[in-house]
Amino acid sequence: MNKMPIPEIYVHNDIEENLNKLGWKELEGYEGEAFSNYIIKPILEEQLKIINDHIGEYKDEFIEKAINKLINEPKPEEILDYIKNGILITLDKGRKGQVSNRVKLIDYKNIEKNIFNYAHELKFKGNDNIIPDFTLFINGIPIIIIEAKREFSEKETYEEAINQINRYEREAPKLFNYVQFAIVYGDEKLYIPTYPNEEKEDRFKKPYKWKNEKKEEDIWDLLKRERVLDTIKNFIFFSKDRAGRKTKIIPRYMQYWAVKKAYERITNYLNNKDYKNRGLVWHWQGSGKTFEILYLAELFYNEFKNKDPIVFIMVDRRELETQFNDDIIALQNANFKDCFKKINSVEELKGVLEDIKESENNPNISEKGVYLVMMHKFDKNKLKDFIESFGSIDKKEILILRDEAHRTESGKFATLRNKILKNAIAIGFTGTPVHKKDMSTFKEYAYPQEGEFYLDRFFIEESIKEGFTLPLIWRVVKPEDIKDISEEEIKNIIEKLFVDEEDADKIVVSKKEIAEKIKLSDLLKSESSIKEASKYIAEHILEDTENFKFKAMVVAQDRKSCILFKKYLDEYLKEKIKNYNENWTQVVITYIHNDDVEIENYKKEIEKKYGKNVDELNKKWTEDFINKENPKILIVNKKLLTGFDAPILKTIYIHQFLKDYLLLQASARANRPAKNKKYGLIVDLTGILIENYKKAIENYNLYRDEAINKDILNNLFVETSKIWESFLTKLNEFKELFKLIVGIEFDDFIVNLKKQKNSKEFKKIISKIILSDKFDYFYAKLRELIQLFEAVGAYGEKLNYYETYEWLKIISAGINKQMRPKSYKIPYNQIKKEVIKYLEFDTYADIASTSINPQLLENLKNKDEINVIVADMIYYALDTLQNKKEPIYRMIYDRINELKNAYISKTKKNEYVINELINCLNALKTYEEEEKTLSKSEKAIKNMLFYLKNVENCNIKKLPLTEKTLKNLEDKKLIKPSDFDKIKKFLFVDLKNAIKETEKRRKVSNKIVEEIIKPIFI
């Protein structure tokens, strides 16, 4: 054998030595055969006789026809299928009829029945004869080539080796009908998929490093004989990319090992070696979770085919469903495709479940399949009657593969799924697991109570290091006008927020109050903020996208903000870019029935303009963003923040308050690798997200540290079954307490209200509860039960208790509404209206709609609704007054609080309490009416005199110096701290005759200024 000259000879010797160690045997004497036919026919014939011992009669003829078919087949996809599954051959035997057999080319079960050879510098026929450094054969079929370069050479690098392999694919395309992948061995040890390039296309194929199970770089681990067979059988496929071009799928090391760990969990469970039937694959964006799911589906289907395996690929968004469906349709060489189906309706799901259950009871029915299904098909309401008669499926050979497993996993859909498929195996995939009190990805898919948080982890730093995602650069842009907001600006903000309020001009809040109440998310919705952000984007977009070599995304606070961004970006980009047109920017948002008028008008506008409905437009613009020139900028709110894979996207402008997993998911849209793309750019237009990002990364990295994991385990995770047992015990205790307070059984209460739907009856019961001396204990028990139920996530046993849970929440909502009814006087509720939409008060929406009305008490004194009304009035008044600081309000508040205690303790007669309550409410109503006509100085004087009389026992009629100073203060636009110091001095003088003791007078003066005057004027 001719050897390469020094120094390359050392590289080649190293390769030969390692191949020999792995059980590959050097091939000699077949150069001519390989040169003409690409395969080594004598070896193949001999091996096929050995591995096809299932064929009896006509074996030689079957084998001859199979070899001829293999040699003459022009399509690499078909040849890969032959290599994976064998070749089906049919012989026509005249009167005997047709005889069929599948001729195996490789024995995947019995590795030693195959022969593994390597050849050094073997020539292959092509337009130019090519000579790979090494060719690896299995049973005479060329499967792998190795191209070697000197490790320490400026000229001979791995890039040169890759270019050489690409040239081979063009010059000897038929060889690559058989060769499945190539190894690059030089300054880097890499592997790439290979396939013919007869069209001589300019291809971009990313080379990968291989790491062994310990995550140590080791290309020889990939070339182990068992690894090669496993990879070919279960992990290599042909497909088409989104542009319709042929491509070849080959596993990356983290995909392979994650799938193998998940498969080990599956086999141990099905072979009764372990009770564990779930697992979490925690892999960051760009690691290829879609194909991890498809690999595992194929592996499970292939290995358990004789047990009628069932696979449910579950997603929770239409975009993901479409993506998976398209990817599976494009996939070739996957055996599971023979029985793949997308479940389009709840009725179809019922049919599939019924077929599976019937196959359990009837051995003559074979039911296997791979199903793509939306989580929302497991709808308790739509499946209620079905489930009552159907029950559960006992079959264990059911695999649930759940993408984006951090979402939709603690509610009714997951609970119902787990109830029906009670013995199924569930493997969850996510880049951002969630751990909150009511939802924990770790608890749903792992065994944290046993120290297992995941089967496999591949997070951000590993992804960037391996080149599967790019580094992210953050640019923080802090709006200047928020640095030192003035009182006038506060006034303007209030006018915008409450423009439709009748009393908007009377809403006066201090700088401190507005800072506490108005959140960043509210400010990010303001038109002025969006306008300024759009101006900034227009000024930087060309630089940030490299003159639109790449594309951009704008993430807005809400859907209305998206439309405003479109308006202002069009305006400012038109000024900056000469050839700009409005198709460069498009809004991709969700539209709902009865949308706000601005969104509805925009919807009508674009549907008319483009002649398509908004769903079609969203789909078109999303696809065009990836594959076409326009749009160049997508404007989004929630859509596309997760699961959107667009390597062309480089820059994301974030004008939304994001944190935790959603921030990580959103930022990951920018760092997908693309040709000549060095990094992803995040422009933080809020000024604070970078700290949120760092915190989220730190939180996730906690789960890598074994010591911290142990601490987390001890402090945060409790076995779900124990939580459930606690829930059941405490539910029984709660029911006994309910009966003690209300006088009826809890279950009877539910039955009666379901029949009557009587809100008055409900209010009576709520009032009894509120006015009971056991109320605090009752309410604590109620909240604890709700929290325990939510804490068990998608635990299957929950399903039978959902109605109980709903009624617990209704009671809680009823108590909250009766104790804290909404008041038009508190404008901050409007600021938080988006939050209020999510409160679950649908069932009894009209229960607590009472306003303060003393006359109502007079009219109802002798009616049985009195308990309800007293409870309403007391708690409404207390809630309304509790944040009021003026002495008049405080005095009324304290008196009503005394009446509440007297009413509950029964130390005063009902009539006395009611009469006193009427007096308080009348006084409150009178002062509220009077307050509307008072200036700030008049309001301050009235409250000071009230305080001095009722608290300090000073019967003083006038405070002349103080009053004059306050009136002057009222005309000032800017109030300084020194102004309040001046008031203290004048008040100290005014009180000279009323409070003789100097120190006490100073304290009273200071207290009045701090607690009465300042809150009114600031």
Swiss-Prot record:
Keywords: ATP-binding, DNA-binding, Endonuclease, Helicase, Hydrolase, Nuclease, Nucleotide-binding, Restriction system. InterPro entries: Helicase_ATP-bd, HsdR_RecA-like_helicase_dom_2, P-loop_NTPase, Restrct_endonuc_type1_HsdR_N, Restrct_endonuc_typeI_HsdR, SWI2_SNF2, Type-I_R_enzyme_R_subunit. CDD domains: DEXHc_RE_I_HsdR, HsdR_N. GO terms for molecular function: ATP binding; DNA binding; helicase activity; type I site-specific deoxyribonuclease activity. Gene3D superfamilies: 3.90.1570.50, P-loop containing nucleotide triphosphate hydrolases. Its EC number is 3.1.21.3. It is an enzyme of class 3 (hydrolase). PANTHER family: TYPE I RESTRICTION ENZYME HINDI ENDONUCLEASE SUBUNIT, TYPE I SITE-SPECIFIC DEOXYRIBONUCLEASE PROTEIN SUBUNIT M AND R. The type I restriction/modification system is composed of three polypeptides R, M and S. The restriction (R) subunit of a type I restriction enzyme that recognizes 5'-GAYN(5)GTAA-3' and cleaves a random distance away. The R subunit is required for both endonuclease and ATPase activities but not for modification. After locating a non-methylated recognition site, the enzyme complex serves as a molecular motor that translocates DNA in an ATP-dependent manner until a collision occurs that triggers cleavage. This is Putative type I restriction enzyme MjaVIIIP endonuclease subunit. It comes from Methanocaldococcus jannaschii (strain ATCC 43067 / DSM 2661 / JAL-1 / JCM 10045 / NBRC 100440) (Methanococcus jannaschii).
